[in-house]
């Protein structure tokens, strides 16, 4: 955690030729654009496999561990970014304007009049890296596995929950029959896997896909090696239908300490570093051969409360503080949080104060609470709310309804400096209410999270242009089947009204009506107090301009490089000083851009659906 394109919408014949021509000119203009229109950075090292010249290696520093290479279960942002490089998706977001769709594995599509049957044409020029052809049967098998195997639903089950039947009448035709209309049918942000490989996997839920290399895929890169918490290595897929990447190797190298990653960038040991702190970004400003990219963020950063962990079978588990079951208590906590201070002091201006659930980058879905509804910073009101709700203060300590002092456990990510910095403020602000806060920062927050063993936690998901996945995280269907299972739930929310609104928005094809429903969902989520958005942090990243000549940001204006809804950044990247080599074989040069233009022309000719796609883990937990 998607796109727009033909389908249930009226096709407009007039203007298509003009629009296509304009789009071609726009994209051709991209080719001639100065380097400032892109990001830059890459490195060179040993000789190429053929012994000719030096090998161009693009090295990306990452802080988040890649816990699995299984596309059915990957939800971490680091892992879902790898999936986009390894496997093709049915459709792609346009890198210049993510509100538009481009063909991916599917070259075109159509829908029945009742919008319940979707037929996709699967391209005939895609090949698995082991030499076998990609067919519609691979896509049908992928979706059917997700429909019938609970383990395979973990990452993207929301896409198939409404599927009735998926078939492949022939190698080039995929047919999906729905139970009811579904607005995300051009946003099926699902990695399609090779049936002949995955049918051999006995337990999808436990399979990590990290033992046999290279991993068979059909994306722009082929994963050749992985060592947990050390690196992930890729080589370019020379047979990728959109054109081979220009770099000889792409390496994601793990740095637990982001200061060490920044130091490596300065030394030229890595090409690119994401998720910079304000201090790190400031230290790089003006540095030779280094460019800092400060892009509008596509994720939210929030506080999530434990509302009482439970499973679909009704069993409760975990050990969340019982005071958090009280909406007034939750609201009081958030009245004591000064979001402006968080933005000014922790983010140092590299972000926007939190309000609704969807970041302001997505204007159609961005929601603000009314003045009367807003949980504004007001410590006096927070204290009054606690008093009124029965949480009295005695001797400077806030007591629960059993007369015991309240201590809350705050869980944070050890690899995220923002969490650590913000926790100090929260401890102070809640301490003024008489509530003690014990902060624990962990390398892996996943285990206590799924076990429901926390009170409050720092939470964050990347949001795609279509918000379906981050909304699905809070439905009853996202709960684990039993306490021993892992669901897609973010923090165990299950509410009939929210579920009803979710069902309405997924079935609504009218963009404005759907957006209104989504905003109603955001309003409910805000009022519930189950979670509260602190801020929308910018994507602050840096790269070496003496290593990468050009790289595509998404969107083109004020866009990010890391965590895109697609593979555009690494696929398009061109080595500095290697123009002749980079342009051969049609990588990220003019031929590739023209290829995107041609694909966009196809999309324009088919129709324009409002974007409905999901993730880079689209909406992946961070």
Residue ranges, per PLM feature:
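Detector for C-terminal structural segments
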Residues: 2, 41-44, 227, 334-367, ...
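Surface-exposed binding/hinge segments that line
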Residues: 50-53, 121, 155-201
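Short, well-ordered beta-strand elements
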Residues: 54-64, 107, 117-120, 139-143, ...
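N-terminal lobe/hinge region of extracytoplasmic solute-binding protein
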Residues: 61-113, 144, 216
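Gly/Pro-rich hinge or "lid" segments in bacterial periplasmic/extracellular proteins
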Residues: 96, 190-245, 249, 379-380, ...
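Aromatic- and charge-enriched surface segment that lines or borders ligand/interaction sites
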Residues: 107-152, 175, 261-264, 322-324
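Alpha-helical secondary-structure segments
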Residues: 135-142, 173-177, 219-220, 248-249, ...
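Ligand-site clamp/hinge motif
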Residues: 237-284, 427, 436-438
């Amino acid at each position: 955690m998607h796109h727009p394109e033909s389908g249930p919408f009226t096709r407009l014949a007039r203007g298509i030729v003009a629009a296509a021509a304009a789009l071609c000119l726009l994209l051709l203009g991209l080719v001639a654009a100065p380097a400032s229109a892109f990001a830059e950075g890459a490195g060179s090292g040993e000789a190429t496999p053929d012994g000719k010249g030096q090998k161009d290696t693009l090295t990306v520093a990452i802080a988040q561990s890649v816990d699995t290479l299984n596309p059915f279960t990957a939800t971490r942002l680091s892992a879902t970014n790898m999936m986009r490089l390894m496997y093709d998706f049915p459709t792609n977001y346009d890198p210049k304007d993510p509100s538009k769709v481009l063909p991916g594995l599917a070259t075109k599509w159509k829908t029945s009049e009742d919008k319940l049957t979707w037929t996709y044409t699967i391209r005939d020029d895609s090949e698995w890296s082991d030499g076998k052809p990609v067919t519609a049967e691979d896509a049908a098998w992928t979706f059917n596995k997700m429909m019938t195997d609970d383990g395979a639903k973990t990452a993207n089950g929301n896409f198939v929950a409404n599927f009735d039947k998926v078939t492949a009448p022939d190698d080039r035709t995929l047919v999906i029959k729905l139970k009811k209309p579904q607005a995300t049918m051009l946003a099926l942000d699902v990695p399609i896997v090779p049936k002949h490989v995955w049918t051999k996997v006995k337990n999808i839920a436990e399979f990590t896909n990290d033992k046999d290399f290279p991993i068979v895929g059909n994306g722009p890169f082929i994963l050749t090696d992985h060592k947990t918490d050390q690196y992930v290595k890729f080589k370019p897929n020379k047979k990728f239908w959109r054109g081979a990447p220009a770099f000889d190797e792409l390496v994601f190298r793990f740095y637990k300490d982001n200061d060490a990653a920044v130091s490596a960038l300065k030394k030229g040991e890595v090409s690119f570093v994401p998720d910079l702190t304000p201090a790190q970004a400031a230290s790089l400003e003006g540095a030779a051969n280094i460019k800092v990219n400060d892009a509008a963020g596509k994720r939210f950063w929030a506080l999530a409360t434990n509302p009482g962990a439970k499973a679909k079978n009704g069993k409760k588990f975990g050990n969340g503080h019982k005071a958090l079951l009280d909406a007034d208590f939750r609201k009081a906590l958030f009245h004591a949080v000064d979001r402006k201070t968080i933005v000014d002091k922790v983010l140092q201006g590299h972000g926007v104060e939190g309000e609704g659930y969807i970041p302001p980058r997505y204007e159609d879905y961005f929601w603000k609470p009314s003045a009367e509804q807003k949980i504004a910073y007001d410590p006096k009101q927070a204290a009054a709310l606690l008093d009124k709700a029965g949480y009295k203060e005695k001797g400077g300590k806030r007591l629960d309804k059993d007369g015991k002092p309240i201590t809350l456990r705050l869980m944070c990510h050890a690899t995220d400096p923002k969490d650590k910095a913000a926790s100090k403020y929260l401890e102070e602000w809640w301490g003024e209410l008489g509530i003690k806060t014990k902060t624990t920062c962990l390398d892996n927050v996943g285990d206590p999270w799924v076990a429901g063993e926390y009170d409050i936690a720092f939470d964050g998901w990347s949001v795609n242009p279509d918000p379906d996945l981050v909304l699905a995280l809070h439905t009853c269907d996202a709960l684990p089947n039993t306490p021993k299972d892992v669901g897609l739930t973010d923090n165990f929310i299950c509410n009939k009204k929210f579920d009803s609104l979710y069902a309405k928005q997924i079935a609504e094809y009218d963009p404005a009506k759907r957006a209104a429903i989504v905003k109603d969902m955001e309003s409910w989520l805000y009022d519930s107090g189950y979670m509260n958005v602190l801020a929308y942090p910018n994507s602050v990243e840096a790269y070496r301009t003496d290593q990468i000549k050009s790289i595509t940001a998404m969107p083109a204006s004020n866009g990010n490089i890391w965590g895109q809804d697609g593979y555009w950044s690494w696929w398009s990247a061109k080595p500095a000083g290697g123009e002749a080599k980079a342009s051969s074989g049609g990588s990220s040069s003019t031929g590739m851009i023209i290829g995107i233009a041609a694909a966009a022309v196809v999309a324009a000719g088919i129709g324009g659906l409002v974007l409905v796609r999901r993730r880079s883990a689209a909406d992946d937990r961070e």
